[in-house]
C-alpha cells in the first residue's frame, strides 16, 4: 500500500469535509428579509469632481450614491436628499426639496457631470450647512426626530481650510461623514468627520472599490436594525439578523424548505447530498501570474473529484483583489469540462487584497437563489489567499458561519494565520490549511488515482473526519516536489526537508487499506529512503 504524501493528505481532509450532509450543518439559509426602515433624515452629499477625478471614476461615485439612495425611505415626510458638486467652485445639483421619490433621485444622479477644476472642500462644506440644509432649499426645522447628515466624498488635499467650518457644522448638530479615495489627505478626513471617527471616516484605495462602502451607509441609516429581536420576521425556527434585514435558517437536523421560511426534518439517510460550492480566489498583485496559473490548476483538481450535475454538485467562482468579480455563478456550467475551461480562461486581476469585501459578496450574492443557489443544498465556501486583507474580515466571516455556510480557508506564503482561523468554520483546525509555497499547490491531489469515497469499513481518524481512502502502489520518497516549504532542518545523513500541514490536531491511528498509517500534526521530516519518515512532533510510518 502507498501512504498518502503530505499534499495528498491535505486535499484528502479538505475534500472529505466538503461533502458532509447538509443536515449536519444546522443552519441552511436562503430567504432574505425586508429592507430596513430608515429614520427621517435631511441628507446632503458633497462630492468632489476636481480634475484629479477622471470621468470613469466619477461614474463609480454615482453608482455608490445610487446604491445608498436605493436603501432609503425617500419622501417629503421621510428622507430628503440633496447633492452638492464641487471643484474650484460649488454647484448645487439638486436641493432637498427637489425630488420626492426614489426614482426621481436616481435619475437626477445619473445626469450629474464632473466640474474638473480645483478642490475647495471647505467652501463646499460651508455651502452645505448654510445653503443646502436651509429651510429655503427644503431643510426641515431642527428636531430630535429628524437627522441632519452630510457625506463628503473627496480624493485630494483641499485648497482651503476644512477644520473650522466642519467644527461649526458638528456644533450645530450636523453629522459629518468623510470618505477619502486614493491619495487623499487623511488628516483632512479626520478634521471633517464627526465622532467616533472610526464610524465616520472611511478610506478606499481607488474609486473602483468605493461601491463597497454603500452597505455601511445603508446600515447606518436603518431605524430598525434587528428585525429578529423585534419579532418582525416570519422564520419558523431560526432568524439570523443583519442590520435592517434577516435570513431564515434551521436548527441542526432540519433543512430549509424552498419558501425560505419553514423547515423539514432531515431523512435518516443524512439528507440531500447536493452541494453548492463557491471558490473565493485571491487575485492580488502579490500572487504573481505564474502562481495564479497554479491556483487555477488547484481549483480544477478539486473540480475533478466532484459529481457535477443539477442534483449534486454546483460550482461558482469569484475572484477578488481591490474589487470583487464574479467569474461565473452557481449552476452556469453543468459539466466538469465546462467548469474547468472557465477556470482556465479566468484572467488575473492583479491589485489589492480585499478579502472582507469578497466574503460580503459571497453572503449577499453568491449563495442567493437568484445566483443559482438551491434550496436545501449544502453551502460551501473555499477562500484562497496569499496575504493580509486590506479590509476588515471579522464581521463578514462571522456572518457567513452564522448563516450555516461551511467555510474553508486555504493560505499560501504570507497568508496571516489569524485571518485564516477567523474565516474557517468550526472546528477551526479542520477547516483551514496553510502551505509555504505556491509550487505545492500544483502537487496537491495531482491526477488523483482514486476518487475519495467512504466505504463499508471507514477508517476512524476521529480528530479530523471518519473516512477511508483507497490508494494503490508503493510508498514513494517524499521529494522536493511533494513538500510545502523548503526549510532545511538540522541533522546528518539523508536529505531532510520540512512539511507543515495544518489539517488538525494529533490524528488517531488510521487504517488505510491493508496498511497502517500513524500521523501526528507537526513538522514532518521526509527521509530520502521513502520507506518511512520521522517527525519532530510524532511519528509517521507504514507497517504491512
From Swiss-Prot:
Modifications made to the protein after synthesis: N-glycosylated; reduces binding affinity for type 2 collagens.
Q: Where is the signal peptide?
A: 1-26
Annotated SUPFAM superfamilies? Chicken cartilage matrix protein, vWA-like
Instruction: State the compartments where it is located.
Output: Secreted, Extracellular space, Extracellular matrix
Pfam families documented for this protein: FXa_inhibition, Matrilin_ccoil, VWA
List, in alphabetical order, the Gene Ontology terms for molecular function in this entry: calcium ion binding
- Alphabetical list of Gene3D superfamilies matching this protein: Laminin (2.10.25.10), von Willebrand factor, type A domain (3.40.50.410)
- GO CC, alphabetical: collagen-containing extracellular matrix; extracellular region; matrilin complex
EGF-like domain residues? 224-264
**Glycosylated residues?**
77, 345
User: What cystine pairs are annotated?
Assistant: 228-239, 235-248, 250-263
Q: Where is the VWFA domain?
A: 42-217, 276-448
- Tissue and organ distribution: Expressed in trachea from fetus into adulthood (at protein level).
Q: Report the InterPro entries cross-referenced here.
A: ECM_Assembly_Org, EGF-like_Ca-bd_dom, EGF-like_dom, Matrilin_cc_sf, Matrilin_coiled-coil_trimer, VWF_A, vWFA_dom_sf
What Gene Ontology terms for biological process does this UniProt record contain?
A: extracellular matrix organization; growth plate cartilage chondrocyte morphogenesis; regulation of bone mineralization
Alphabetized UniProt keyword annotations = Disulfide bond, EGF-like domain, Extracellular matrix, Glycoprotein, Repeat, Secreted, Signal
Q: Which domain of life is it from?
A: Eukaryota
- Known function: A major component of the extracellular matrix of non-articular cartilage. Binds to type 2 collagens and forms long concatenated protein networks as part of the extracellular matrix. Required for the network-like organization and bundling of collagen fibrils surrounding chondrocytes in the zones of maturation and hypertrophy. Required for mechanotransduction and adaption to mechanical loading in cartilage chondrocytes, resulting in an increase in expression of the extracellular matrix components ACAN and COL2A1. Acts as a moderator of angiogenesis in response to injury.
Q: Which PANTHER family match?
A: CARTILAGE MATRIX PROTEIN (PTHR24020:SF16), COLLAGEN ALPHA (PTHR24020)
Q: How does it assemble?
A: Homotrimer. Part of a complex composed of MATN1 (via VWFA1 domain), type 2 collagens and type 6 collagens. Forms a complex (via covalent bonds) with ACAN; the interaction increases in abundance with increasing age of the organism via an increase in occupancy of MATN1 binding sites. Interacts with COMP.
In Swiss-Prot or TrEMBL terms, this protein is called Matrilin-1
Source species:
Bos taurus (Bovine)
Taxonomic classification, please? Eukaryota, Metazoa, Chordata, Craniata, Vertebrata
Amino acid at each position: 500500500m502507498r501512504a498518502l504524501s503530505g499534499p495528498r493528505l491535505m486535499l484528502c481532509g479538505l475534500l472529505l469535509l466538503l461533502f458532509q450532509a447538509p443536515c449536519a450543518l444546522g443552519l441552511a439559509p436562503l430567504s432574505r428579509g425586508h429592507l430596513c426602515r430608515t429614520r427621517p433624515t435631511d441628507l446632503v452629499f458633497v462630492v468632489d469632481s476636481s480634475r484629479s477625478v477622471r470621468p470613469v471614476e466619477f461614474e463609480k461615485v454615482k453608482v455608490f450614491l445610487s446604491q445608498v439612495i436605493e436603501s432609503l425611505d425617500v419622501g417629503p415626510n421621510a428622507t430628503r436628499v440633496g447633492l452638492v458638486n464641487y471643484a474650484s467652485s460649488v454647484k448645487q445639483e439638486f436641493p432637498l426639496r427637489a425630488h420626492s421619490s426614489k426614482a426621481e433621485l436616481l435619475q437626477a444622479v445619473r445626469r450629474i457631470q464632473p466640474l474638473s477644476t480645483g478642490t475647495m472642500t471647505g467652501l463646499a462644506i460651508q455651502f452645505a450647512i448654510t445653503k443646502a440644509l436651509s429651510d429655503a432649499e427644503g431643510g426641515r426645522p431642527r428636531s430630535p426626530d429628524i437627522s441632519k447628515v452630510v457625506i463628503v466624498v473627496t480624493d485630494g488635499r483641499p485648497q482651503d481650510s476644512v477644520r473650522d467650518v466642519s467644527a461649526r457644522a458638528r456644533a450645530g448638530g450636523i453629522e459629518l461623514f468623510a470618505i477619502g479615495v486614493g491619495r487623499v489627505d487623511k488628516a483632512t478626513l479626520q478634521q471633517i468627520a464627526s465622532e467616533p471617527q472610526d464610524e465616520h471616516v472611511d478610506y478606499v484605495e481607488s474609486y473602483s472599490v468605493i461601491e463597497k462602502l454603500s452597505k455601511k451607509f445603508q446600515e447606518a441609516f436603518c431605524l430598525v436594525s434587528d428585525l429578529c429581536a423585534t419579532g418582525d420576521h416570519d422564520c419558523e425556527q431560526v432568524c439570523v439578523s443583519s442590520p435592517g434585514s434577516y435570513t431564515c435558517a434551521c436548527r441542526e437536523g432540519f433543512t430549509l424548505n424552498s419558501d425560505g421560511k419553514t423547515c423539514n426534518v432531515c431523512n435518516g439517510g443524512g439528507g440531500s447530498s447536493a452541494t453548492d460550492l463557491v471558490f473565493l480566489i485571491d487575485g492580488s498583485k502579490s500572487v504573481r501570474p505564474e502562481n495564479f496559473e497554479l491556483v487555477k490548476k488547484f481549483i480544477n483538481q478539486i473540480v475533478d473529484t466532484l459529481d457535477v450535475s443539477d442534483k449534486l454538485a454546483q460550482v461558482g467562482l469569484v475572484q477578488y483583489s481591490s474589487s470583487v468579480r464574479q467569474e461565473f455563478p452557481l449552476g452556469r456550467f453543468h459539466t466538469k469540462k465546462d467548469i474547468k475551461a472557465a477556470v482556465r480562461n479566468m484572467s488575473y486581476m492583479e491589485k489589492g487584497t480585499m478579502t472582507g469585501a469578497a466574503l460580503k459578496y459571497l453572503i449577499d450574492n453568491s449563495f442567493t437563489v437568484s445566483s443559482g443557489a438551491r434550496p436545501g443544498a449544502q453551502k460551501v465556501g473555499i477562500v484562497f489567499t496569499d496575504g493580509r486583507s486590506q479590509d476588515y474580515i471579522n464581521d463578514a466571516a462571522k456572518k457567513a458561519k452564522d448563516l450555516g455556510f461551511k467555510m474553508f480557508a486555504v493560505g499560501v506564503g504570507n497568508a496571516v494565520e489569524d485571518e485564516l482561523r477567523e474565516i474557517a468554520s468550526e472546528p477551526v483546525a479542520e477547516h483551514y490549511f496553510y502551505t509555504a509555497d505556491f509550487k505545492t499547490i500544483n502537487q496537491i491531489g495531482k491526477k488523483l488515482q482514486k476518487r475519495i469515497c467512504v466505504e463499508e469499513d471507514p477508517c476512524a481518524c476521529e480528530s479530523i473526519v471518519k473516512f477511508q481512502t483507497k490508494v494503490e502502489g508503493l510508498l514513494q520518497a517524499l521529494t522536493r516536489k511533494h513538500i510545502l516549504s523548503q526549510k532545511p532542518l538540522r541533522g546528518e545523513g539523508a536529505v531532510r526537508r520540512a512539511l507543515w500541514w495544518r489539517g488538525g490536531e494529533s490524528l488517531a491511528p488510521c487504517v488505510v487499506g491493508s496498511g497502517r498509517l500513524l500521523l501526528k500534526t507537526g513538522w514532518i521530516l521526509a527521509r530520502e529512503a521513502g520507506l518511512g519518515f520521522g517527525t519532530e512532533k510524532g511519528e509517521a510510518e507504514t507497517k504491512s
